[in-house]
Amino acid sequence: MSELTPSDLAFAVADPTRLRLLVLLHTSRRELCVCELTTSLDLDQPKISRHLKALRERGVLSTRRDGQWIHYRLDPQLPLWAIDVLRGFADGTTGQTPYVDDAARLAHAGCAP
C-alpha cells in the first residue's frame, strides 16, 4: 500500500458513515470489532462492512484477526498530518448528534473478547 494521500483522506471523511466510524475509532483509542461498530452506529452489518473495506483499501484503517473476530483500528502508520485532520474532526464533533450517541452506545457494546 502506498502512503495515504490527502485525496484518500478526503474520500474517507466525505461520507457521513465513514466519518462517524473514524471519529469513533479515534476517540475510543482502541480496536473495535464490527459488532461494536454496528451497535455504536446503529446501522446494519453490511453497510458498516462496506465502509470499513473502503477505509482499509485507502490505508486509513488496519485490521487484526483474533479467531472469528476482526478488530479495526486507525492504521498506526498514518502520517501525522492525517492524525491531525482526524483529531480536528473529532474535536469538531464533540457534543454533536450522532457522535455523542455513537459513543454512548459503544460504552454498552461488549461483544468481542
Q: Residue ranges of each PLM-predicted region?
A:
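Amphipathic alpha-helical dimerization/coiled-coil segments
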Residues: 1-4, 80-113
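Residues in the helix-turn-helix
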Residues: 47
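Beta-hairpin "wing" of winged helix-turn-helix
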Residues: 57-66, 73-74
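Histidine-centered divalent metal-coordination motifs
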Residues: 18, 50-51
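N-terminal helix-turn-helix DNA-binding core of bacterial DNA-binding proteins
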Residues: 2-44, 69-78
